[in-house]
Amino acid sequence: MSGRKKSLLKVIILGDSSVGKTSLMNQYVNKRFSNQYKATIGADFCTKEVVVNDRVVTMQIWDTAGQERFQSLGVAFYRGADCCVLVYDVTAPNSFKNLDSWRDEFLIQASPRDPDHFPFVVLGNKVDLDNRQVSTRRAQQWCQSKNDIPYYETSAKEGINVEMAFQVIAKNALELEAEAEVINDFPDQITLGSQNNRPGNPDNCQC
């Protein structure tokens, strides 16, 4: 594995308080779930090393507080994100309605190079519970209306689709990073047609 190229990918998880953001991160990184709810204060992160397309990737996964007083964490927190995960609780309709606000908040704060094609992933969490309020179809329609955002229904408690979802998150984040590397490899743009740069102009002689 030492010959593989390594990458650090910054992934931000957003969503209302108590939708299961911390539990999803802990299930993915530590294979652990706790029934004791503890609100995240500000932001925290975990890292996990995975292999995507024969490339070693260190995912830096940022878990954020969902309370309103923490909603504006500042430009520095969002800057440099390679993927944004939007999480809602399938038993809490308001958490689904607020996905628009969280998506807008991210785009405003992060100011990605190409906002229309920035990689988001939506997770409908707590599918292990019986009192579901948001249908799969409704969630899929919302994702389709936002440029076909990938959508997964998960259970942090049971580990349902958590590994699969984060594999897609890593893959999409890596693709964004690769595109950014290609753009940065291009030299500065040269403007042609300037009168002073035309051949034969005596004032532009390089002799």
Curated annotation (Swiss-Prot):
Membrane topology of this protein: Lipid-anchor
Keywords assigned: Autophagy, Cell projection, Cytoplasmic vesicle, Endosome, GTP-binding, Hydrolase, Lipoprotein, Lysosome, Membrane, Nucleotide-binding, Phosphoprotein, Prenylation, Protein transport, Synapse, Transport
Catalytic reaction list: GTP + H2O = GDP + phosphate + H(+)
Lineage top rank: taxon: Eukaryota
Subcellular location(s) of the protein: Early endosome membrane; Late endosome membrane; Lysosome membrane; Cytoplasmic vesicle, Autophagosome membrane
Stored InterPro entries: P-loop_NTPase, Small_GTP-bd, Small_GTPase
Tissue-level expression: Expressed in eye (at protein level).
Annotated binding of GTP, by residue: 15-22, 34-40, 63-67, 125-128, 156-157
PANTHER family, per database record: RAB FAMILY (PTHR47981), RAS-RELATED PROTEIN RAB-7A (PTHR47981:SF20)
Protein name from the UniProt record: Ras-related protein Rab7
Gene giving rise to this polypeptide: Rab7
